[in-house]
Design a protein with these regions (language model features):
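A catalytic-pocket lid/entrance helix-loop region that shapes and gates access to the active site
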Residues: 9-72, 112, 122-133, 137-146
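Alpha/beta-hydrolase fold active-site neighborhood
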Residues: 71-192
Length: 192
């Protein structure tokens, strides 16, 4: 994370004031973060979804979660459905279009919450059966929470100054859940 980078820089510049630091998700300072999201997410999903795939009861009920996700994303890319869903925050009925990018973003954020990510295989299976309301409600709820929780201006100030040049579309990311969504989106924001 960029917070980790700040901690590393502080420790490097002020060793006399740093007794110890605890870092989570350490990435070398020289590595651009813009192009590691897609591969890292797919690696995390392989571990998370692998738990279900190795459990006969889970696999029997939900199939192969990664294959189910890939099937859902393909469907949403070709024909994104209009979904009637109940807003998880207000309880109001709403309508919206469920897009592959929305689901990819949802899956990305849930990779940070392993306990909550246990919901995804079931919701993905339901969506593949044409029942999109649960997934749409969760995606909209997550989107609203993230707008309040993430300081995009702060993140972009660091991303754009440190990693903008490294954010390029890469062929090897095309088959991942995120594809080139993150580097393209961040590069566009940094260009403004």
């Amino acid at each position: 994370s960029y917070g980790t980078r700040v901690a590393q820089q502080y420790a490097m510049r002020h060793p006399q004031a740093t007794h110890s630091i605890v870092l989570d998700s350490v990435v070398p300072n020289a590595q651009g973060l813009g192009n590691i999201f897609a591969r890292n997410l797919d690696d995390a999903l392989a571990l998370q979804f692998g738990v279900c795939s190795k459990d006969p009861a889970c696999k029997g009920k939900l199939g192969d979660p990664r294959a189910e996700l890939d099937r859902l994303l393909a469907t949403l890319r070709s024909t994104p459905p209009t979904v009637h869903y109940r807003d998880a925050t207000s309880g109001e009925w709403k309508q919206g279009v469920l897009r592959a990018d929305t689901v990819a973003g949802l899956v990305r954020m849930y990779a940070y919450m392993p306990l909550a990510s246990g919901l995804l295989p079931k919701l993905i299976q339901e969506a593949n059966g044409g029942h999109y309301a649960g997934l749409m409600a969760l995606a909209q709820m997550m989107s609203g929470e993230m707008q309040d929780a993430m300081a995009m201006g702060m993140q972009l100030s660091v991303v754009c100054s440190e990693d903008a040049r490294s954010m390029v579309a890469r062929e090897e990311d095309a088959g991942t859940v995120l594809g080139n969504l993150m580097p393209k989106g961040m590069a566009a924001m940094c260009a403004v």
